[in-house]
Amino acid sequence: MSVLVIAVATESGVPIFSRKRGNSENIQFSTIASLHGINMFSKCHNLLMVNTQVDNGNILWKEYSKSVTLIGVATGGLECDLELLLSTVHNLMIFSIGKKELDSFKNIDQIKRDLRQCYPILDYLLESLDPEAVLSPHPTLVLDLIQSILCPQAQQLQQALDNYSESLTGRWACLSIHGRLVATSSDFGELDPREARLLLLLAATQDGAPLRETPVYLPQISPNVAFRAVTCKLLADVYILVVCGATPALSQIDEIVLQCWEGFAQVIKDAKVAYPRNFPMSISFEPCVLGILLVNTNNQRCVFSRHLHATNQKSRGMPGAHKVDILRTFYVTAARELAREHKSRGGEKDELEELDGMCEVTWVSEYHKCHARRAGNLLCCALYSSSVPSHTMRLITNQMLQDISTNKEIHW
């Protein structure tokens, strides 16, 4: 598989950047010019070039604010929502340099230099789409969800985050373990899920830096005025991020971190034990369940696990990368519709209105089965071995939803 993202200036066609992941060859300037030329030719004839199919893949063009055109190319059978990927990349560009600067394009060379700061996040984002990168620490799933860990310590950590944020006169704090969201401050829900994902990505790409500050523009709340995001490494693979003003200085923040978090070292270590299972041990899963994706539709958070059982149990012969790929493909192509709210607009019949009453969907193949069911704000997508009867599969999914929704150790 391979995925490629190209950014060009809409009017001049000057390449801004190109980033790729996978086994595709490096993109040549002539190829970039040809791809952009196709889009410009269509515009000259009042046509909209949406996407096109190529051998074992597709290409998508998206123009933003008449200043930048993003081109996405996915090949090798990768199930990737290119439109969502390009939208995320555009938000990342705003996140890095601000909407006003991106829309004006006064100095392309300067913009190209400024956008280099977003390359680590962009590369991280592209690598996270690769199901073969099972040894990578990057969370691997879908672009419209915030991958999380559910652990009993979340409420204690939320109180600590509130205290830490208040000490810095900041807002919107979160704690991540292995790049997955574990706990947030009380006001974190004010952020648009797209902004929350970008902040989590920023924390996940710190490369071990103990303390770092980064100017960020929140695409929905403040696209033109920068905030200051301060990221601190507490333990190995454990980071806290808070959005605050110009003060206090980093040297003072170092002291505040010690004061606020010194007493929570054991709590954080206990929370780390939940990884890579990502669910409390009080929740048990049937041996025939090979993997699970749990989605909270209220806050766009999800929990994914392919390590549901003890390590001494048999793995049923399915590689971990294959489980990831199956569950993601199942969610993107079928189960995602269960997570959406379909509302008719202005009395007109929505084209997806017939899905309003649907609460489950099933996939059956020769080697595995997938079943998804929604109950309230929770959507459970489960991967089963092919020998499990369909009626048993439905009963198990329903029981998992009930166990998860009533478990008192789960705090979103």
What do these predicted regions represent?
Residues 1-412:
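Intrinsically disordered, Ser/Thr-rich regulatory regions of eukaryotic membrane-trafficking proteins
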